[in-house]
């Protein structure tokens, strides 16, 4: 069985004078600070769009609440109000062209999971407005709140196509549930593209609430600019001398860091002869490949 590598959520911070988005691709490599002379290499597993905005405040309010009238959210018993501002007050939302924003739900695990369920399963609709009394809000359906982390391209671990994708999701969830604590707010461009202000209010109308969350939800429960990362990377291992004295040979990733590196999987294997030629490429025992010598 392959060991499960170290995982974490990393947060990127935008410079205050930034006036445009910054795209961080999946697979972006990071290195930790050295501990006892050794650092760890990580790579991000999902693409990230970093926006020069911050969450000014967040509040969950039950009935009676003050919010724009939303005809798509009849029967709402609570509303989550999120207030965003640009890092630079001189930058307007209309200059950014922001259509989607990713939120990471953090804090105590029990509260974060409860809030995730509330937003993912009990949102009736969304309103984008200037203030709670805005008479002309932009209304979005509940589908504007989207779960993140379940797509194959967002996998923490490389996964063979022959294996059921659900097993990977279960492995990742039980080993690192924080990977799935992300939600996207989509369709924001309907408001932000014409928002000549550095302030934007987002209202999520809910058909259920929690007295405990109403007391505890604030801006600290959300984080922007976050993405999962995993301590897993490709590397050519040290050559193995075949002396035919044993049936097992140790695969050593890096002789200089033997105590802090570990093999997760072997993706390819080639024979190299003394003259430097490499006539044979070995396939995996379970590979569906046939080599014909014609």
Which sequence ranges carry the predicted segments?
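Extended assembly-interface regions of large multimeric machines
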Residues: 1-133, 137-142, 147-149
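Extended, solvent-exposed segments with strong compositional bias
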Residues: 144-183
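Ser/Thr/Pro-rich, low-complexity mucin-like regions
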Residues: 183-223
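Conserved small/polar residues in nucleotide/adenosyl-binding loops
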Residues: 283-290
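Intrinsically disordered, low-complexity boundary segments flanking structured domains
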Residues: 1, 66-70, 113-114, 186-192, ...
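Cytosolic catalytic cores of cyclic-nucleotide second-messenger enzymes
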Residues: 294
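Exposed low-complexity, polar/acidic, P/S/T/G-rich flexible segments that act as propeptides
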Residues: 208-278
């Amino acid at each position: 069985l392959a060991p499960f590598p170290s995982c974490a959520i990393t947060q990127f911070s935008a410079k205050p004078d930034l006036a445009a988005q910054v795209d961080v691709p999946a697979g972006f490599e990071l290195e930790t600070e050295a501990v006892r002379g050794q650092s760890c290499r990580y790579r991000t597993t999902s693409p990230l769009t970093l926006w020069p905005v911050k969450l000014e405040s967040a509040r969950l309010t039950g009935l009676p609440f003050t919010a724009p009238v939303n005809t798509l959210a009849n029967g709402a018993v609570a509303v989550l109000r999120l207030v965003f501002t640009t890092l630079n007050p001189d930058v307007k939302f209309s200059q950014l062209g922001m259509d989607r924003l990713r939120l990471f739900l953090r804090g105590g695990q029990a509260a974060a999971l409860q809030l995730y369920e509330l937003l993912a399963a009990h949102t009736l609709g969304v309103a984008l407005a200037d203030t709670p009394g805005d008479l002309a809000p932009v209304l979005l359906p509940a589908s504007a709140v989207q779960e993140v982390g379940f797509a194959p391209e967002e996998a923490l671990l490389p996964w063979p196509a022959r294996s059921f994708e659900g097993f990977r999701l279960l492995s990742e969830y039980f080993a690192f549930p924080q990977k799935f604590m992300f939600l996207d707010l989509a369709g924001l461009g309907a408001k932000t593209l014409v928002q000549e202000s550095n302030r934007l209010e987002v209202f999520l109308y809910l058909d259920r609430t929690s007295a405990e969350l109403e007391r505890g939800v604030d801006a600290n429960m959300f984080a922007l600019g976050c993405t999962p990362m995993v301590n897993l990377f490709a590397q050519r291992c040290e050559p193995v001398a075949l002396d035919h004295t044993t049936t097992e040979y140790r695969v050593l990733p890096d002789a200089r860091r033997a105590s802090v590196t570990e093999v997760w999987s072997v993706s390819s294997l080639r024979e190299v002869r003394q003259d430097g030629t490499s006539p044979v490429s070995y396939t995996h025992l379970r590979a569906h490949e046939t080599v014909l010598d014609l």
